[in-house]
Amino acid sequence: MATKLFVNLPVKDLNRSKAFFTGLGLTFFGQAEDMASVIISEHTQVMLLTNTVFASYARNGVVDATAGTEAILVLGVETRDQVDQLADRAEEAGGSPVGTPRDDGYRYQRGFTDLDGHHWEALCLIDPAG
């Protein structure tokens, strides 16, 4: 059984992408001139790969995330305030909001794109029992 998750994302400008994720309050584990690993949690990392490196792994080309959504990456947090803080930091770091906040009683979430157009959501699940 797998115990860790590594999500690989292509980026056009690695230094700009590193600055964006640093702006979200995230840190890195391992960096090279063509890749950097963003620590999401103890068991999850997002590997930022330059388009050239990503293409060397991809079986059928690199998708332009600004032209279509290849995935929605969801970051789970504990509170509504943390959802707002993360989404606000993303916008301050140069990302763009996606849609409007969703609040349906059992979850609260806000979406944003990073500098390469990858779609992210900050999500808090709300216990209906309080």
Language model regions located:
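N-terminal beta-strand motif that seeds the catalytic metal site of vicinal oxygen chelate
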Residues: M1-R16, L24, E70-L75, I126-G130
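Short connector loops at helix/strand junctions that flank enzyme active sites
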Residues: A2, S41-H43, T66-E70
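Short beta-strand/turn micro-motifs at beta-sheet edges
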Residues: Y57-V63
